[in-house]
Curated annotation (Swiss-Prot):
Pfam families: Pro_racemase
SUPFAM superfamilies on file: Diaminopimelate epimerase-like (SSF54506)
Disulfide bonds, paired cysteine numbers: none
GO MF terms, alphabetically ordered: 4-hydroxyproline epimerase activity; trans-L-3-hydroxyproline dehydratase activity
Lineage per the UniProt record: Bacteria, Pseudomonadati, Pseudomonadota, Alphaproteobacteria, Hyphomicrobiales
Family: Belongs to the proline racemase family.
InterPro entries: Pro_racemase_fam
Name of the featured protein: Uncharacterized protein BOV_0353
Gene3D superfamilies linked to this entry: Diaminopimelate Epimerase, Chain A, domain 1
Species the sequence originates in: Brucella ovis (strain ATCC 25840 / 63/290 / NCTC 10512)
Length: 342
């Protein structure tokens, strides 16, 4: 075999959502901070295209690049690559990265609990891993500060009319809409329709509402989170959600950043307080167990510090190669499986 590059990957998924991890073969990108490094990856696109596009990737795949941390508090940094974005943070991907670091021995596992500090592009995250028999069985992540932006904002959608939405940030930016407003239910059989209408709502929200992070250069809404009503038992709230990810796929997990954004909205509306828990359920029925740990402030905005908890499993190892005669060094996308990102 001949190859001009070899990239070593450990496959992983968190509650159904793929979050593979590059563990070797890629040098750290330029940048003084992990955020700057992630902007290089986003703008350059060479690595993104190689690992995400067909024939080596697919629209279902997210890939994380391990990098040396820039913050002295952190043991490892990571950069998240999604089909259409290189985001500040991801709950499912941070759970995958933590699991791979421990299960593969890159960071030494301590049973029954391992504590780690990781550096995402969006900031420092604290990780607590419940470990047994050489396996990280559950990962809890203190997410970056999360906040509600707009509440009960009118949004005009072609074919639907005016719907009421919230916008919020939970490590990434969301427009949040109740499924009943768009005449849908969150179930696997409606996945294609949910993804398509979700991307349509995201586009409209960017055009009509917009978003700007108070501290980071993040000036767009990334995702539409479609929700069903929250139920409550004591101090535990439970809610089903699904997140439409551009170009048009559904997150298979409950979306950790989405759960964080939803908790921020619930808190802003007086429906959730510090110390209460939230169980987010995905389109597959998998769960993230979350907690609104405390209330704080971010850039003059009321915010929360959320903790998200879930499980991940290693699915295999692989090496991606590039033969010098390969006509597709950057891969390709066809609209039969890669929906048009209009």
């Amino acid at each position: 075999m001949r190859s001009t590059k070899v990239i070593h990957i450990v496959g992983c998924h968190a509650e159904g959502e793929v979050g593979d991890v590059i563990v070797g073969g890629v040098a750290p990108p330029p940048g003084e901070t992990v955020w700057e490094q992630s902007r290089f990856i986003a703008n350059d696109e060479t690595l993104r295209n190689f690992v995400l596009n067909e024939p080596r990737g697919g629209v279902f795949r997210h890939v994380n690049l391990l990098v040396p941390p820039k913050d002295p508090r952190a043991q490892m940094g990571f950069i998240i690559m999604e089909p259409a974005d290189t985001p500040p943070m991801s709950g499912s991907n941070s759970i995958c990265v933590s699991t791979v670091l421990l299960d593969s021995g890159i960071i030494a596992m301590q049973e029954p609990v391992t504590h780690m500090v990781l550096e995402a592009p969006g900031g420092i995250i604290e990780v607590e891993a419940e470990c047994r028999n050489g396996k990280a069985e559950r990962i809890s992540v203190r997410n970056v500060p999360s906040f509600a932006d707009r509440l009960d904002a009118p949004l005009d959608i072609t074919g639907l009319g005016t719907i009421m939405v919230d916008t919020a940030y939970g490590g990434d930016s969301f427009v949040i809409v109740d499924a009943a407003q768009i005449g849908m239910k969150i179930e696997p059989g409606q996945a294609r329709e949910l993804a398509e209408i979700g991307v349509k709502i995201t586009k409209a929200a960017n055009e009509q509402l917009g978003f700007r992070h108070p501290e980071r250069d993040w000036r767009h809404i990334s995702f539409c989170q479609i929700t069903e009503p929250v139920t409550r038992e004591g101090d535990v709230l439970t809610g089903v959600n699904t997140v439409a990810i551009r170009p048009a796929k559904l997150d298979r997990s409950p979306t950790g950043t989405g759960c964080s954004a939803r908790m921020a909205v619930l808190h802003a509306k007086g429906q959730m307080k510090a110390g209460e828990r939230f169980i987010g359920k995905s389109v597959l029925g998998t769960e993230f167990h979350c907690r609104l740990d405390k209330v704080l402030e971010l850039g003059g905005k009321p915010a929360i510090s959320p903790i998200i908890s879930g499980r991940a499993w290693v699915t295999g190892t692989s090496q991606l190669m590039l033969d010098p005669s390969d006509p597709f060094p950057h891969g390709y996308r066809l609209s039969d499986t890669w929906p048009r990102d209009e």
